[in-house]
Amino acid sequence: MIVLLGAGAGYYFWTQQPEEPLPAPISAPEPAPADAPAPQASAQPEVRYPVPATEEAPAKSLPTLENSDPMMRESASTLLGRKAFEAMVRPTHLVRNVVATVDNLPRETAPTRVMPLEPVPGRFIPSPEKNAARYTPYVRVFEALDARALVQRYIESYPLFQQAYAELGFPNRNFNDRLVEAIDDLLAAPELASAPELVQPKVLYEFADEDLQQRSAGQKIMLRMGAENAARVKNKLREIRRELVQR
């Protein structure tokens, strides 16, 4: 499938803490008066990472975004193996959930309700060593992915991802740019000499170090999975990034 386990890989390692409530929706602004001059359309931003050319044309045309789940399930099952797919992947709204997850990872929060992967089994353990051990089987699955095949499937299906990104509210932006940006943000996660200290001011655990707590959602996921797991995930992310930008 796509980059379901690429930039979105960090969601394998989501801690099972209760999700913070979302802020109230922002009301739409009042429409401008009828005689107000129309604003000038802003120029489209430069595309930094064009989608690489496919090595061969897809054998058949793509389904619509609404009907894309069967194709995506088949692709993900082929890449991951059926057993891992059934245990780890949420089987509906795959393209939209991948796009939302990729877009959220570099942000402050990343709601679990739109992630394409099932949370790690078991409850969050505030002991860094014990908590990291829960993720090792998932890291092995991620490491075993064929980066070239993963990116090839993503490229062949790219129009669906771009459409979902436009529907998310970014009609003039390139989703592939956001994907590379999300991968780069994960790769920039701090590499600590020792496990970070956690505190529990209310319901949720937080990093005691304010700098770590202010990091992006994706980087905090990398920190929570433990240094060894994070290093292994970063190695695979580098492979995927090379395939995305050097074709």
Enumerate the predicted regions with their spans.
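Hydrophobic membrane-insertion alpha-helices, especially the h-region
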Residues: M1-G8, F161
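Hydrophobic single-pass membrane-insertion segments
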Residues: A9-L22
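N-terminal Sec/ER secretory leader and immediately downstream segment
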Residues: P23-K130
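Acidic/histidine-rich, surface-exposed loop or edge segments in extracytoplasmic proteins
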Residues: R73-F85, A132-A144, Q213-Q219
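Surface-exposed patches in mature extracellular/periplasmic domains of secreted proteins
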Residues: E86, T109-L117, A149-Y154, Y165-L179, ...
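Mid-length scaffold segments of soluble, non-membrane domains
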Residues: R123-D177
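Conserved functional acidic sites
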Residues: A189-A193
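A cross-kingdom marker for long, charged
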Residues: S194, L198-R247
